[in-house]
Amino acid sequence: MENNVLQQLKENIAKVMIGNERTIELVLTCLVAKGHILLEDVPGTGKTVMAKSLAKSVEAEFGRIQFTPDLLPSDVTGLNYFDAKSGEFVFSKGPAFCNILLADEINRATPKTQSSLLECMAERQITVDGVTRPLEEPFLVIATQNPLETLGTFPLPEAQMDRFLMKLSMEALSPAEETQMIARFLTEEPLAELSSVCPKEEIRALQEACKEVYLHPELVQYLVRIVQETRVNSKIASGVSPRGTLAFLRAVQGHALVQGRNYVVPEDFKTVAVPVLAHRLTMQISADDGRAAESVIEEILNRIDLPTENWSGR
């Protein structure tokens, strides 16, 4: 069942997101692994459309927050207001009470407002005036930021960055893919015509199935060697945390599930390592050239020998 549902989701989103097969697979990996996504790319590359396409495909409630410097934490979480008719305080839910939340241009809001998302992302709950309210599963945050604009922005703190399972960019379209996009959007509105292919209950079942994906003991040691290497590398000031190790684990399990397997293979590590680990590294000043973190992760993967086994064996 899992294979059919995930294949239907991939095909449905691809009706709108032309030429982004890898990104679609990684977004679905985050969804089944219960992880959040940071999409960093220039405007107009389809970040918002990706989030909306996913929400429509899984029959999920979609919420969007346009982050600005004057946005308040209560604009994210909601607030209590006094109802004159009833003479009582009433809670008004904020846009974070949804299944898929698009946090657009998250780095334009102040750190105080950014941190209001932290409890939502980490604990999947919201506390306002001492009252804690759980968020409905599935709950996925897709945050976006523009890497080219830094004026008037507030860089995400490390604690917030560590809460994102993956940091992704949209894929550049080939001439053939761009031609296909023009032809499709010339006479159609693919996003408006997109319909749901699975209910939220099936997504919750996929998230449970992700935890059961088999990881061979040799691959457990392979994972450990990768994260340990980030802590002793001379180019890295601060390596992957234990939370990052567990995120890496869930990501490889999720990617295996998206690929139609109930067991992890070494290729899963190679596919998700950079999106999962690079944004968790603090580089030495002398080594940071913009892509240094990605390059170091790739070097580590190339340096560590791949174990060879029958990965599906129990």
PLM regions: where:
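Pre-Walker A (pre-P-loop) alpha-helix and adjacent loop at the N terminus of AAA/AAA+ ATPase modules
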Residues: 3-45, 224
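Conserved alpha-helical scaffold flanking the Walker A/P-loop in AAA+ ATPase domains
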Residues: 25-29, 82-102
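Walker A/P-loop
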Residues: 31-68
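Walker B catalytic acidic pair
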Residues: 41, 104-105, 116
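P-loop (Walker A) phosphate-binding loop of NTP-binding proteins
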Residues: 42, 76, 144
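AAA+/P-loop NTPase substrate/partner-engagement loops
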Residues: 57-85
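Canonical AAA+ ATPase core
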Residues: 83-88, 109, 121-198, 203-213, ...
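C-terminal engagement/docking regions of AAA+ P-loop ATPases
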Residues: 232-314
